[in-house]
Each structure stands twice: as structure tokens, then as C-alpha cells.
Amino acid sequence: NTSLHEGEPALMTAARTGKPGAVKALLSHGAKVNAKGRKSQTALMWAAADGHLEVVTLLLKAGADIRATLDSGFTPLFFAVREGRTEVVHTLLKAGIDVNEPVSREKNRKLKSGTTPLTLAVENGHFELATTLLEAGADPNDMRAGYTSLHMLSWVRKPDGGDGDDDLAPPTGSGIMSSAQFAKQLVDHGARVNTRLKGGKLHWKGATPFFLASKTADAPLMRVLLELGADPLIHNAENSTPLMVATGIGQTMEAASAGTETEILEAAQMLLDLGVDIDGVNNSGETAMHGAAYKNLPKVVLFLDDNNAKIEVWNRRNKKGSTPYLIAAGYRPGNFKPSYET
């Protein structure tokens, strides 16, 4: 039970490095199976995170606490899920862990309250593991985090940008299952494809998975969701249409949101073909043309005009007093330069 100077017991070191022989020897000589390191990690947490299945099995047989929890809210199962350790997850579930047990907000402010093993697997791109969780009874319609796993696919596939280019990349994940294939798995396991968000930012309240896929101009995902029964005409709570959010409503920073202008044009054409009203006006007095102005998309402006968007509808001030022209000219909240081409 001697600890290294970092506070790590010898058993934890053996578990972390995947040494079953050393683990057996230490346990047989009285090592405390639930001893904690300096940051309260246990040997089982380390073995689970690093995917050392044989060590995990040895520790469980020796009485390791499968529900040991860090201040972050992470248990051995959450460590295994985050790292995509499918075999370890199988073993922990067989040991009696509830597949739908969420991380509590009190213990982890970094994770969304209500995060479950399923949503954590989806967030990290482990779609085969997520399917394993579905087969073990994970609820595909769980909304304790504020959204379902089907909603999540839109931002997992095409994350909004941040300060660096790395923020634009989807998670590397594990396995060979694609996110589109996983969407079908979700529906096969009972996911409701037209579930609407109950809260969140104003522009996303009431959004369906298809609505959010439109927001990121993800035409391939939009097609998959349509095949699975998505209704493309469902508005959000603000009465915005999928076309409005595809062109830019609710996304006031050009570089910070997913979707290139080419992708937006493809999504917009698809939405018009599906019967979405090009002249829709939301509760804030905004139209698809306002969206194109917010995102500085001159080709989308021309596209809307070519498809007979009525100037008498879109050339009006929204509730903040801005027409699409004024928005493009930089007269909007924030430090925006005029987009002369728009």
C-alpha cells in the first residue's frame, strides 16, 4: 500500500500500466483494492480508462467499487465510455452498473447536467460503443441533458468553430460505424426522430434533429433524417423555419458557425424542394434574407432572389430595427465591418 511521491499507490500504478501479474501479486499481499490516489482516482478507474480488460476483471473480483465517483462526477464507467473501451464497458455493465445513470450537475459543472454514458459516447464519436449501450438498454430518447442523442449528431458531425481551427474538427472517435449509420441505429432502438428541444437558447428551443442539421447545413444528415421520417416543415419556438437557420438566423458570427456557403446553398435548395416557405417570417420579424445578411453570404442572397423571395417581405426591419441591407452594412450589435459584396 506504499504510495509514490505523487500519491499513487502501487496497485494503481500496476492497473494504469496494464500489468495483471503485478496486480495479482499486490492484491494477494494485502493491497487495498479501493485505495485512492492524490486526486481520488482508484485503480479501477485507471484500468477502465486505459482499456486494460484483464486488470479490470481482476479488480472487480477483488471487490473494487464500480460506483466510486470523483468530484468531477466520473465513475469507472464514464472513464471507459469517454475513451471508447467497449469491452471494459461490457464488463462494467455486467457487474451491475445502470446504463442510464447520469453525471450529476453538483459534481461536474463542465459536463452538461444529465449527461449519460450514451450521450458521452456520442459526444466523443464512439458510435459502435454507443450502439452497444443501446443494446444494453440505454434510452435513446433521454433528454435529461436537454437534448437527445439524435439532436447531438448535428454538432458532433459539424462542430461550431471557436478560437482555433481544431475546434472545427469532429471527434476522432473509434470503430468503423459512421454517424449516419448510428442515426439509423438510434431510430431502430426507438429514437423519436421529430423530438423537439424543450429549452436552451431562443433560436434552438423547439428544434428537431432535422432543424439542427439544417442549421449546420449538413445535407447528408438531413437526407438520412428524412429517410428516417423527419418532418422538414417543423418550426422552432421562435417560428423560424429550417431554411432561416440554414441561411444564418441565430448565427451572427460568420466564421463561428458550421456550414460553408456552398453547403448552405445545397441545404437551402433541398429545403425549398421539400416545400419550406422561402418567405417565412419569424416572431422577431426576420426572414431567410436576414440570415444571409448576418452570415455575409452574397451567393445565398442571389439564390434567394433567383428563387423569387419577395422583396416586400424581406425588405423590412426586424424587431431590432434592421433590414437585411442594414445588417450587411454593419448596423447590428457587436463589432462588425460592412460586407460590401453582400
Predicted regions and their residues:
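Leucine-rich solenoid repeat scaffolds
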Residues: 314-342
